[in-house]
């Protein structure tokens, strides 16, 4: 025991021996309680101050001992400490019993009110390691496994076609993309790191696309909206139409105009073709080619234009009417009466039937009436009052309505491998035509209508489906003024749908399933 410790014990013993009899005397005397309590409080305060001074002296000695000790001594944390006395000293149990002196590894522990350093000082917390995607170089004939997120956008777009369950883009993910093999002379990790692929103009925020759009439709829409333009090809069409060759083709999945797929770029006034494509899919007709709206950098005006997928499987048309089947209005009315190829019946030669199935004319008439497309069945504009800007007026065809039976139909197109069904092209519609000027000549001779389309028109879900479908095409949605502008177009279609239902009921036309 050191000298300061002995001195502290002597002082404690002396104070207790002097104060004890005086405290008893004060307690038993007849002094006022207020004065007695004051004396007791003063004595306790003096003794408490003495104890605090002793503890402070011990803390000072502990600080000096810590500074003199070795900093890297790790054995001090292995000594068990059963209790901490108030006088600041600490000794192992065996040294307290036999009175032996402390060993040099004495530890002093004091309570501090505030930490001078943070709990986790620098160097004690293991930092998080960032992921590194470096890929080692390989030999020319070797292969490297690369995660899909590290593949360059050009390589990823080309490889996506090999995965049938995946829809390319950020917004829809039908299935998990597997690992793929990359072939090449050298594959370096720095070249594979891409921060983020560009966002697609076809936006799908739900888990899947609308049910009326197939996976192939979505794939082709993304190709038209996001595919790089490789070159511009000459076309036989008039009106400033251009044929664009697109990159990112997939072998066998998209009909192309050669080794790469192509898109037919039209004028801004033909934007209604995008609306026509979505309406065709919602009605269950599936006769139009995929169409999207797009802005191109090489066009200076910056206005969005419709781009329609070019299908090389269509029967070429070199005549003036741009049709694979040359047919007049009079012949068309005779075909409607003969009901060619209905119920698998082979027509007789004297009927003059074409290879087109009878139900195809009903689908075309319904579709053209809703959009008021006159350039197929009424090229001379004989069923309504045309305007000066209409093609029939500009071409001087309006006076030819006296002999309508000889008027040739236009844009009647088939596929080479499927001549029974029609393909609707040049679907420029008109939304500004008033209800008292609708072209009912388009419905002349039609006695049956497709059940799938009529059921959608009668339901209350046509507006909801059109909004949901047109929202996918971001460029078209914004070009029409957002939802407010799209709602106005849908209002026109809904009014025409009610008029068509009234026409069907008034003329006793039948509604039949046409899913042959």
From Swiss-Prot:
- What are the protein's UniProt keywords? Glycoprotein, Golgi apparatus, Membrane, Signal-anchor, Transmembrane, Transmembrane helix
Residues with attached carbohydrate: 286
The way this protein sits in the membrane is described as: Single-pass type II membrane protein
Q: Which residues lie on this side of the membrane: Extracellular?
A: 56-516
Q: Does the keyword Transmembrane helix apply?
A: yes
Show the disulfide pairing: none
Q: Which InterPro entries match?
A: FAM198
Family under the similarity heading: Belongs to the GASK family.
Q: What protein is this chain from?
A: Golgi-associated kinase 1B
- Annotated organism of origin: Rattus norvegicus
Which lineage?
Eukaryota, Metazoa, Chordata, Craniata, Vertebrata
What gene, per UniProt, encodes this protein? Gask1b
């Amino acid at each position: 025991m050191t000298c300061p410790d002995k001195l502290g014990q002597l002082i404690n013993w002396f104070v207790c021996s002097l104060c004890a009899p005086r405290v008893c005397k004060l307690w038993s005397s007849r002094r006022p309680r207020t004065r007695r309590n004051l004396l007791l409080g003063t004595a306790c305060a003096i003794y408490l101050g003495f104890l605090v001074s002793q503890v402070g002296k011990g803390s000072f000695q502990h600080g000096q001992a810590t500074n003199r000790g070795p900093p890297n001594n790790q054995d001090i944390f292995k000594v068990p400490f059963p209790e901490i006395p108030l006088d600041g000293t600490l000794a192992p149990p065996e040294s307290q019993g036999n009175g032996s002196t402390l060993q040099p590894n004495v530890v002093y522990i004091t309570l501090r009110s505030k930490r001078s350093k943070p709990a986790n000082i620098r160097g004690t917390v293991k930092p998080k390691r960032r992921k590194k995607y470096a890929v080692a170089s390989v030999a020319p004939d070797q292969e490297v496994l690369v995660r899909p997120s590290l593949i360059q956008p050009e390589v990823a777009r080309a490889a996506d076609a090999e995965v049938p369950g995946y829809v390319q883009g950020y917004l829809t993910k039908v299935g998990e993309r597997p690992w793929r093999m990359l072939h090449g002379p050298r594959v370096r990790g720095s070249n594979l790191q891409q921060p983020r692929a560009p966002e697609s103009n076809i936006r799908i925020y739900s888990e899947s696309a609308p049910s009326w759009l197939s996976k192939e439709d979505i794939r082709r829409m993304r190709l038209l909206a996001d595919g790089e333009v490789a070159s511009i090809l000459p076309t036989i069409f008039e009106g400033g139409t251009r044929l664009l060759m697109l990159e990112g083709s997939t072998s066998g999945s998209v009909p192309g105009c050669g080794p790469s797929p192509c898109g037919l770029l039209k004028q801004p006034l033909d934007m209604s073709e995008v609306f026509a494509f979505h309406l065709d899919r919602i009605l269950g007709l599936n006769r139009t080619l995929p169409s999207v709206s797009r802005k191109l950098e090489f066009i200076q005006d910056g206005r969005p234009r419709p781009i329609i997928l070019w299908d090389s499987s269509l029967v070429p048309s070199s005549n003036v009417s741009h049709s694979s089947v040359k047919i007049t209005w009079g012949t068309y009315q005779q075909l409607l009466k003969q009901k060619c190829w209905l119920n698998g019946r082979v027509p007789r030669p004297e009927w003059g039937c074409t290879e087109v199935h009878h139900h195809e004319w009903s689908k075309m008439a319904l579709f053209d009436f809703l959009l008021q497309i006159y350039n197929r069945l009424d090229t001379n504009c004989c069923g309504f009052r045309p305007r000066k800007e209409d093609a029939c007026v500009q071409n001087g065809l309006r006076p030819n309505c006296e002999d309508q039976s000889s008027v040739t139909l236009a844009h009647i197109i088939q596929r080479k491998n499927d001549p029974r069904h029609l393909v609707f092209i040049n679907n420029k519609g008109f939304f500004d035509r008033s209800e008292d000027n609708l072209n009912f000549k388009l419905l002349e001779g039609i006695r049956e209508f497709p059940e799938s389309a009529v059921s959608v028109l009668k339901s209350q879900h046509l507006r909801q489906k059109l909004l949901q479908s047109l929202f996918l095409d971001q460029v078209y949605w914004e070009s029409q003024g957002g939802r407010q502008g799209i709602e106005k177009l849908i209002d026109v279609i809904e009014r025409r749908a009610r008029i068509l239902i009234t026409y069907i009921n008034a003329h006793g036309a039948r509604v039949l399933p046409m899913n042959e």
